[in-house]
Amino acid sequence: MMANETAAKSTKSSPTPAVEPESKLKILALHGYRQNGDGFKSKLGSFRKFIGKHAELVFVTAPHIAPPLPDSEAGTEPDPAQRSWWFNKDDGTFKGTNKNGPAIGFEDSLKLVEKVWKQEQCCGLLGFSQGACFVGLLCDLSARGMTSIKPEFAVLSSGFRSGSLVHLNCYETKVQIPSLHIYGEADEIIPKEMSMALADTFTDPQILTHPGGHFLPAQASQKQTYVEFFRERLQFHLEAQEIENATAANSILVDDSGPAGNGVHDDDDDDDDSD
């Protein structure tokens, strides 16, 4: 009898420990046209300090090298440090205000960010200029189940709607996740009206304006907005993780009870304990 009891106990798997919740948000950061991940990280030094208690940024570099500037000397080689997520002009360049053009290389960039998103286990998106345009597209694609990226929130600085023909149907339904939209009143590269139009594709967008031009501001006057936004996002993220862990723990208890409720289950069930 004692041997049978011992055998029964040995076949019962020990409860899988709950996964410790992440203490910070992990956010995929997408740079602008003719930028790269390292340069974008350098530019956001003050911003990263503001949000460092609540969030960590994961920087990725676009896969496409931008061509030399139009006023470059003949024979100038492309600068590998100047990157683009896609090109929306037939000459293989990009301009935010261009309409009804192609989206050359977009699918390659989509595959890249999907890979990094999964590897880094990110939960939010941040983008600047072309990167913010990309973030807007990713949010829409996610809502329609057309990408593996599932952002909980998004931050878009100097963003705009893509004018590429293949993207024109991406803004028919409003995105239902929390979003912070940042733009400069004096932005001459992406006029504020374009950023406002992108913000209008989100439900209840939070707007932060500044008197400057084409950059993501990180001054004392913006700090409170950033801190409060990311603190709230972290709170919701941790609460969701707690619910997920509790659900997983309850599932394990149900599995451990066995089909007859005697704490014994078949060998085939052991693999399920790791889910």
Swiss-Prot record:
SUPFAM superfamilies: alpha/beta-Hydrolases
Top-rank EC class of the record's enzyme: hydrolase
Region (Disordered): 1-21, 253-275
GO biological process, one term: response to retinoic acid
Compositional bias segments (type: Acidic residues): 266-275
Domain of life: Eukaryota
Protein name (Swiss-Prot/TrEMBL): Esterase AAEL000016
Organism: Aedes aegypti
